[in-house]
UniProtKB/Swiss-Prot annotation:
Gene3D superfamilies: 3.40.190.290, Winged helix-like DNA-binding domain superfamily/Winged helix DNA-binding domain
DNA-binding region (UniProt annotation): 23-42
Annotated source species: Acidithiobacillus ferrooxidans
GO molecular function: DNA-binding transcription factor activity; transcription cis-regulatory region binding
Protein name: RuBisCO operon transcriptional regulator
Organism classification: Bacteria, Pseudomonadati, Pseudomonadota, Acidithiobacillia, Acidithiobacillales
Residue ranges constituting the HTH lysR-type domain according to the UniProt record: 6-63
InterPro entries listed in its UniProt record: LysR_subst-bd, Tscrpt_reg_HTH_LysR, WH-like_DNA-bd_sf, WH_DNA-bd_sf
Family: Belongs to the LysR transcriptional regulatory family.
Length: 309
């Protein structure tokens, strides 16, 4: 056989297995039985003339040929998707999907913005994935989505990152915390105050730790959580203070559960970024959504509504 005889179906199957590094998970995603999936991968390997995976114990690994084919598959499938979208655009159609992956912190405004976009473009089927930074970076590396919303673009990846909204970080405490009565608090004053933080690798935590380290302060971490809600509940319960995006605490400020501390150097001025792999040809739908993000954030109607620290 020759690689020219490989089918698009086989390439899609191989790409799924390479993405998950698991035949079982790929079969589940594609709604195929594992035996049927294995047959297609074996036939593709025969067409290539090289094994695509090595199996060591229960784990599989890409061979050199598999690595090369993975890169080719991404290019082929991306080009095909882009072609499909271009044809739809030329025909004046708004069909197909828009896949957006965003941080859990943005759940306070990105769904609202996506809803506004869908109202203007009812023919676009949108898929929203919400996760933490580590998961989003994994998805970005695999090019699983059309667009990624991040508070801090990855420095180790070749990406395009366009800022579309402010994302100030503030120090937050329970309303009756003694420090809420003070002004212009020196960062060093917080050296012995217990902090409730997001999980290691979180963009918010990275920014907070970097700031305090620059001021000679190593944060005293009492607890860490993978969600803003858990962090806020712990702070409201008096277990410590935290650093969060201002967009996440509007309700708690209004209800009197939490307060922003006046710490020197805060708020930390950050941005929200629309991110995609460099070299990727973004679809007309992705481009339209990015334009909507910029416009909505500029006029403040659907963008992140931020409290004043």
């Amino acid at each position: 056989m020759s690689i020219r005889h490989a089918t698009l179906h086989q390439l899609k199957i191989f790409a799924a297995v390479a993405r998950h590094m698991s035949f079982a998970r790929a079969a589940e995603e594609l709604h195929l039985t594992p035996p049927a999936l294995s047959i297609q991968v074996r036939q593709l390997a025969e067409a290539v003339g090289q094994p695509l995976f090595d199996q060591i114990g229960k784990k599989i690994y890409l061979t050199a040929a598999g690595e090369a084919l993975t890169s080719a598959c991404h290019d082929i499938l991306d080009r095909l998707e882009y072609f499909t979208q271009e044809i739809a655009a030329l025909q004046g159609l708004e069909k197909g999907s828009l896949k957006v992956a965003t941080l859990s912190t943005t759940k306070y405004f990105i769904p609202r913005m996506l809803g506004g976009f869908c109202t203007e473009h009812p023919g676009v089927a949108t898929v929203l994935f919400i996760g933490n930074r580590e998961v989003l970076l994994e998805r970005l590396a695999r090019n699983q989505d059309d667009l990624y919303i991040l508070g801090q673009p990855p420095e180790h990846m070749n990406v395009v990152a366009e800022a579309f909204a402010d994302n100030p970080l503030v120090v937050v405490a329970r309303l009756d915390h003694p420090l809420t009565q003070e002004k212009d608090i020196e960062p060093s004053r917080l050296r012995d105050v217990p902090f409730i933080l997001r999980e290691p690798g979180s963009g918010t935590r990275l920014a907070a730790e970097k700031f305090f380290e620059q001021h000679g302060v190593i944060l005293k971490t009492r607890m860490e959580f993978g969600s803003n809600e858990a962090v806020k509940q712990s702070v409201a319960g008096g277990l410590g203070i935290t650093v969060l995006s201002a967009s996440t605490i509007r309700a708690e400020l209004a209800s009197g559960k939490l307060a922003i501390l006046d710490v020197r150097g805060f708020p930390l001025e950050r941005k929200w970024y629309a991110v995609y792999p460099a070299g990727k040809r973004i679809s007309p739908r992705t481009k339209a959504f990015m334009e909507y993000l910029f416009a909505a954030s500029a006029d403040g109607e659907n963008g992140p509504s931020l409290p004043k620290p």
